Amino acid sequence: MKRILILTVVLLSGVYLASAQSTRYTAFEPASVWNDTDGNIINAHGGGVIFVKNKYYWFGEKRGRGASEGVNVYSSPDLLNWKFERLALATDTVNAQSDIARGCIMERPKVIYNDKTGQYVMWFHLELKGQGYKAARAGVAVSENVTGPFRFINSFRPNGHMSRDMTLFKDDNGDAYHIYSSRENYDLRISKLSDDYLFPTSKDTLLFSNHREAPAIFKHKKNYYLITSGCTGWDPNKASLHIADNLFGPWKNLGDPMIGPNSELTFGGQSTYVLPVQGKKGAFIFMADKWNPRNLIDSRYIWLPVSVNDGKVEIRWRERWDLKAMKDSK
């Protein structure tokens, strides 16, 4: 009887695991649990996506129980079903003097490819171990492979400025830019990066000073669009959209692009990235995090289509949607 019972349990467990591993998503369900192809919850918060050789790669914060554990990377051919690749950048568990020693805070990682050096370059917001949010630094790491492992290079305050929430943007001509919150989050700044993308240049300017963070930028035709959030800690707030025909400004405030229930609180989320969809003209996905400060691993993801029509941007709430619903922007 025991053998039969054990065999039954093993068989049932195998069926359950196979079911979890074979789950395939056919649509986006914003703010719902989102598992990877192994059946584990996706752990890639505050992240961004890069497209390489017919695959998307999603980099994001690996969150432990109250601690940063580095940067995870996942891959997908369809933006729905994500395979865990590896821990792309780990905290340093050997050298306690390292800027990324275990216990540090690593947030909002973004990766871009440098065509001149052949390296993938990662920037992230870094806070040093034991200092809370006082350090306000930018961290940089590189890899020859998109999935890593990434080698930590350095951390610093760009041109002497505090650097917290941030994103990277690579323009059509290959120039790259670092957009970051500064001066205790009162300022939002932009700096052009060096040719190797490893350092900021002296071309660094203030975009605006109205307490904005969580920058997410995209380009459509000749205009740049910048989505930001207010500064209310882990709590959601109202988004704003700015437009400019030059990255260094001037930027014009177009108001809140969110439409639908709870839109005044960005549907309960906070912006992190705007993803260009390959194969669709002017199609973008707005990426946001719905933070759960009591258990950051369980923070959810809100991905929604971005509509751009004659310069007007709308991000409308949808309970469920797929890429077929996306139309080319005008």
Whereabouts are the PLM-identified features?
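Bacterial Sec-dependent N-terminal signal peptides
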Residues: 1-22
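Carbohydrate-active catalytic/glycan-binding domains of CAZyme proteins
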Residues: 20-330
